[in-house]
From Swiss-Prot:
Known tissue expression: Expressed constitutively in all organs (e.g. roots, stems, leaves, panicles and embryos).
Name of this chain's protein: Probable esterase D14L
Subunit structure: Component of an intracellular receptor complex involved in the detection of the smoke compound karrikin.
Transmembrane segment boundaries: none
Biological classification of the source: Eukaryota, Viridiplantae, Streptophyta, Embryophyta, Tracheophyta
Assigned GO CC terms: cytoplasm; nucleus
Keyword Lipid biosynthesis among record annotations: no
Length: 271
């Protein structure tokens, strides 16, 4: 097993002949977040699953704080994974920050991506002049302070807010588990990198077709953000806002989300 495979807990499942699908999870989760989607893909596709560096199941000794201080570090990891597996072209499904990571990777290697399915994606979380990302700087400062002072307590409060449900729901409990599995100092560093990121200037450079999918109600991504992506991406794009709630709809509302994702995976944008 190569260092890339080991570091990212790389798994390839399915023997399908319709091509390769790469599933990339967002902050606070790991590859298990795709458990409701994978069974629908394995008959038709080869499915690549991995954990982003810093996620709970990864070795914290491999987490390089300077490399992952920007999203480009994660994009380089993604390209290394595709190289390791000798993937010539893939359909990439990225959730949350991994949607943006896939978009960044596609700028330097558009040939590797036939399409990007961007679930709950945002190019910037902070509000700005003529831009509504959903957060003010003081909101983020409070979030970082809470993470730093008592990480376990923060997880318990953040999970239901993010997922959109009470602590008793299976999805909230699952997200709480994967969130709490991350080493606290790594979690804080990753959260700071994500929430302070701004990739708006890169969007016109993304020429691969993009399928933008999000919940009607999402604590982290207002619906107007999807319209912003649609307007500023450099290639063809389409937006679908689902009647779901929360930032992890593939976990909390699989009955709504899985059919939508499958449709965007299987059908291209009609030009």
């Amino acid at each position: 097993m190569g260092i890339v495979e080991e570091a990212h807990n790389l798994r390839v499942v399915g023997e399908g002949k319709r091509g390769v699908i790469v599933l990339a999870h967002g902050f606070g989760t790991d590859q298990s977040v795709w458990k409701h989607l994978v069974p629908h893909l394995v008959a038709d596709y080869r499915v690549v699953l991995f954990d982003t560096m810093g996620a709970g199941p990864t070795n914290p000794d491999y987490f390089d704080f300077s490399r992952y201080a920007t999203l480009e570090g994660y994009a380089l990891d993604l390209l290394a994974i595709l190289q390791e597996l000798r993937v010539a072209s893939c359909i990439y499904v990225g959730h949350s920050v991994s949607a943006v990571i896939g978009a960044i990777a596609s700028i330097s290697r558009p040939d590797l991506f036939s399409k990007l399915v961007l679930l709950s994606a945002s190019p910037r979380y902070l509000n700005d002049v003529d831009y509504y990302g959903g957060f003010e700087q003081e909101d983020l400062d409070e979030l970082f302070e809470a993470m730093g002072s008592n990480y376990k307590a923060w997880c318990s409060g953040f999970a239901p807010l993010c997922v959109g449900g009470d602590m008793e729901s299976v999805a909230v409990q699952e997200f709480s588990r994967t969130l709490f599995n991350i080493r606290p100092d790594i979690a804080l560093s990753v959260a700071q990198t994500i929430f302070q990121s701004d990739v708006r200037s890169l969007l016109p450079l993304v020429t691969v077709p993009c399928h933008i999918v999000q919940s009607t109600k999402d604590l982290a991504v207002p619906v107007v953000v999807s319209e912003y992506l649609h307007k500023h991406l450099g290639g063809d794009s389409i937006v679908e806002v689902m009647p779901s709630e929360g930032h992890l709809p593939q976990l909390s509302s699989p009955d709504i989300v899985i059919p939508v994702l499958l449709r965007h995976i299987q059908h291209d944008i009609a030009v």
